[in-house]
Amino acid sequence: EKQTSLQNFTGVKIGDVKPGIIDLEGCSYVTRETVVGLDRFRLSRGDLLVGMTGYVGETGLVPSVEPAAYLNQRVGRMATESGVADLGYLYCAARSPAFKEFAEAQSHGSAQANVSGASLMAFPAVIAPLSLMERFNGAIADVLEVVLTNHEQAQTLSTLRDTLLPRLISGQLRLPETENLVKALIF
């Protein structure tokens, strides 16, 4: 059911997994009753999602979303205990062309490509010593925070524009500066 009521929750599907940031604009919505007992599928800001059918190997970060978003079938989630703070290495590995190529090579299916979570977990990666990994994750966390924050601010501004512009054009909303300029031009 496609409703945008605040009583409903976003359901993230395969097609919503876009490179970089998850596209929450076109998501479907599910009711509160549908998600009862499904907290393990609730997404958090900074979760890294991966397409497992169709868009095999595509990955994107989950931005803030209110009300909450929930994971749907055939979308995998990669998350860390500390969220964005220690996601850097995993993010860079999963966003690499090598990961996408690996996922596609592991996929099967004649009508639509499918890959299993176990196959994705077999992606060969070099694991650095913990101290180096922590320093790397710390540096990348700042970048990921900026990426997520910029996206979230852009979404807020887009919503504000979509709300205010029609009211401004129709005359329902008046800006004092505009009114003064119009008065100066008329008189």
Regions found by a protein language model. Name each.
Residues 1-13, 127:
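Extended boundary segments
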Residues 1-3, 15-48, 65:
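Sequence-specific dsDNA recognition surfaces
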Residues 7, 70-73, 110, 118-120:
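Short edge beta-strand segments in beta-sheet-rich domains
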Residues 9-22, 42-60, 70-75, 91-104:
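Short Ser/Thr-interspersed hydrophobic loop/turn segments at strand-loop and sheet-helix junctions
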Residues 13, 77-79, 124:
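Short, well-ordered beta-strand micro-motif
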Residues 40-41, 50, 140, 147:
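His/acidic/aromatic-lined binding-pocket segments of jelly-roll/cupin-type domains
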Residues 65-66, 80-86:
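Ligand-binding loop in jelly-roll beta-barrel domains
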Residues 83-85, 89-93, 100-102, 106-109, ...:
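Amphipathic alpha-helical coiled-coil/heptad-repeat segments
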